[in-house]
């Protein structure tokens, strides 16, 4: 805790409000609300916390607060601040999570369509459905029963659906608008669960067709009746009153929360929404934040009723949702809430079970690898790979895996300094010497295992430096690839031998992940460096364009192509004098090519562990 935070903690009021945590860059990383700002904010910097809260606190270098008149006002402000700033430690619902709806359009001749966008356009919307497949299944059934308009053909034409009996051909039929509006109402009744009348009509038509010896048509009506029955079976009735409601339940354990929302439409449970996330406040307060965000999503229509658990502030939810809010005490509605809570508990337990299994697999892999190589369990593994093209821009990279998982903050990148031309062995010698010379000088913790992406030659070079030059006792292994550039063999021992390692084992998969990751990291760094060198060389020799201005151009435009496409005015905006900007354009566009402004997404050249070793 720095002096700034200590000073601000003394100034905190006991009022309700919101607090805003910031990191060293001034970025908002967490927004919270409190009934008592002083007690809540001070709690972050006193006593011990679980791992996730410690991670948050370790990044806080400043905070602000906003006093509100009430707890509910603080809740509403918190939701808006989260939506505006998207802090990384807050609950964030996925923006792209939308469900399909069946829509009866508000047109002269209505259409039946599937949509994910709900608009206030006078149309009727039914849903949400669990996925587009479920929505299409219902729509296909409705298309067979109700011949709505399917196309926008001119008055003299009919569409394909007319010929198969699924369109009335509104352009030529004698039916008026009232007929189609009546049909739309029947569909609406059907989607609301009132399908008895439709089944009775189909049964009557089936009987008439059978009496008229039209057995194929009678069979079609029979199939439609059976399809409706199947649909009824899939959509279990959860409440006899056939209301539309959302049912919320939540469960907390080990610092995590799971919220489940049941979508009950016309008394039938048609879908659920599941979200798991770490929580930092009291569970009931973070639950309220979740509810507020939930109904900000356009795809979440507000139903007639919202059911919530007993421990939630009913008035706070009413401030968030314009609907009837209930905390049921007994009966069907209470059972629905209990079911949502039970499912939240099961989902959270499954998460922890899967996590434990994943940890067991990874831990088992590194333990088995240690036994296989007859070394202590390699908790920390450092791996190296070189990258160059015909000796140009040679680089090397190191990735680190701790407990079988990437530790990206420990990744390192190396520009090769002493090697001329494509000499992979010499490059490996330089990098190993630089890395472990530093480990030795600064008394850094050495790895339990070094893995070289290469064969016998590269491994022997690493051994010479580590064991003979530096006198360090660190096991070194090599990973050879086959002609398809896939992980093939593990080399280890003195002399080096191929280790008998099953390709289906967790140990092999771990080594494969390490080799793929170090190769990716090295080649990404090489491409960046090559691009930068190409950029600089083409801008050499321009009067008034020194290293600093080149760097500014690179930072702003990200690529030489975008500088070529930029106008002189755009280059001037970066801080380059106009006469120099004109010289840049003359050199990059010697043929006087037309310049155009291209709006493209900027490339982010920041990568993991963006550190260069000395």
From Swiss-Prot:
- Domain of life where this protein originates: Bacteria
Q: Name one GO biological process term.
A: DNA damage response
Comp. bias (Basic and acidic residues): 599-614
Quick one: a GO cellular component term? Answer: cytoplasm
InterPro entries linked: GIY-YIG_endonuc, GIY-YIG_endonuc_sf, GIY-YIG_UvrC_Cho, RuvA_2-like, UVR_dom, UVR_dom_sf, UvrABC_protein_C, UvrC
UniProt domain GIY-YIG: residue ranges: 14-91
Compartment(s) of residence: Cytoplasm
Q: Which UniProt keywords apply?
A: Cytoplasm, DNA damage, DNA excision, DNA repair, Excision nuclease, SOS response
Q: Does the keyword DNA repair apply?
A: yes
What PROSITE patterns does the database record attribute to this sequence?
GIY_YIG, UVR, UVRC
| An example molecular function term from Gene Ontology annotations | excinuclease ABC activity
Q: Where is this region: Disordered?
A: 595-614
How is this protein organized at the quaternary level? Interacts with UvrB in an incision complex.
Q: Which family does it belong to?
A: Belongs to the UvrC family.
Q: What does this protein do?
A: The UvrABC repair system catalyzes the recognition and processing of DNA lesions. UvrC both incises the 5' and 3' sides of the lesion. The N-terminal half is responsible for the 3' incision and the C-terminal half is responsible for the 5' incision.
Query: Which HAMAP family does the UniProt record give?
Result: UvrC
Check the record and name the PANTHER family matching this protein.
Answer: UVRABC SYSTEM PROTEIN C, UVRC/OXIDOREDUCTASE
Q: This protein is called what?
A: UvrABC system protein C
Q: Which organism is it from?
A: Streptococcus pneumoniae (strain ATCC BAA-255 / R6)
Which gene codes for it?
Answer: uvrC
């Amino acid at each position: 805790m720095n002096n700034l935070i200590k000073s601000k903690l003394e100034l905190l009021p006991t009022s309700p409000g919101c607090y805003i945590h910031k990191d060293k860059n001034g970025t908002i990383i967490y927004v919270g609300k409190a009934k008592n700002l002083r007690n809540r904010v001070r709690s972050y910097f006193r006593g011990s916390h679980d791992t996730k809260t410690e991670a948050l606190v370790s990044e806080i270098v400043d905070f602000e607060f906003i006093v509100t008149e009430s707890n509910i006002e603080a809740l509403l402000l918190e939701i808006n601040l989260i939506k505006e700033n998207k802090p990384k430690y807050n609950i964030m619902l996925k923006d792209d999570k939308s469900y399909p709806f069946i829509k009866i359009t508000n047109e002269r001749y209505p259409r039946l369509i599937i949509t994910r966008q709900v608009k206030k356009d006078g149309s009727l919307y039914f849903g949400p459905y669990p996925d587009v497949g479920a929505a299409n299944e219902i729509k296909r059934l409705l298309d067979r029963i109700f011949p709505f308009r399917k196309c926008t053909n001119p008055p003299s034409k009919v569409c394909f659906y007319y010929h198969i009996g699924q369109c009335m051909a509104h352009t030529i039929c004698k039916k008026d608008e009232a007929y189609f509006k009546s049909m739309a109402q029947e569909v609406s009744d059907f989607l609301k669960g009132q399908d008895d009348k439709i089944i009775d009509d189909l049964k009557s038509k089936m009987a008439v067709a059978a009496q008229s010896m039209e057995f194929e048509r009678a069979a079609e009506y029979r199939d439609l009746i059976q399809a409706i029955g199947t649909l009824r079976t899939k959509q279990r009735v959860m409440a006899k009153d056939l209301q539309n409601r959302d049912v919320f339940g939540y469960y907390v354990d080990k610092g995590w929360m799971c919220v489940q929302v049941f979508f009950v439409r016309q008394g039938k449970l048609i879908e659920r929404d599941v979200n798991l996330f770490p929580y930092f406040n009291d569970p009931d307060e973070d639950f309220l934040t979740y509810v507020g965000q939930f109904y900000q999503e356009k795809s979440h229509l507000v139903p007639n009723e919202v059911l919530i658990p007993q421990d939630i502030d009913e008035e706070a939810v009413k401030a968030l949702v314009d609907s009837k809010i209930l905390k049921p005490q007994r009966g069907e509605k209470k059972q629905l809430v209990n079911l949502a809570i039970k499912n939240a508990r099961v989902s959270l337990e499954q998460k922890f079970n899967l996590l434990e299994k994943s940890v067991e697999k990874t831990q088992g892999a590194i333990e088995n690898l240690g036994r296989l190589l007859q070394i202590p369990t390699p908790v920390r593994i450092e791996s190296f790979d070189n990258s160059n093209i015909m000796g140009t821009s040679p680089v090397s990279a190191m990735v680190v895996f701790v407990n079988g998982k990437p530790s990206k903050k420990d990744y390192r990148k190396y520009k090769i300094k002493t090697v001329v031309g494509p000499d992979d062995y010499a490059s490996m010698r330089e990098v190993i010497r630089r890395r472990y010379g530093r480990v030795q000088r600064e008394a850094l913790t050495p790895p339990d295992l070094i893995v070289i992406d290469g064969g016998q030659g590269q491994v022997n070079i690493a051994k010479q430096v580590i064991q003979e030059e530096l006198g360090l006792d660190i096991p070194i292994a090599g990973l050879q690839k086959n002609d398809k550039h896939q992980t093939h063999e593990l080399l280890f021992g003195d002399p080096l031998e191929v280790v008998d390692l099953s390709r289906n084992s967790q140990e092999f998969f771990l080594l494969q992940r390490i080799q793929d990751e170090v190769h990716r990291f090295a080649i990404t760094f090489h491409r960046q460096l090559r691009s930068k060198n190409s950029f600089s060389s083409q801008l050499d020799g321009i009067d008034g364009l020194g290293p600093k201005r080149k760097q500014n151009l690179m930072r702003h435009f990200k690529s030489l192509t975008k500088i070529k496409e930029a106008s002189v005015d755009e280059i001037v905006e970066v801080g380059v004098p106009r006469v120099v900007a004109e010289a840049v354009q003359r050199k990059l566009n010697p043929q006087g090519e037309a310049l155009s402004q291209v709006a493209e997404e900027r490339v982010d050249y920041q990568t993991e562990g963006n550190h260069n070793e000395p």
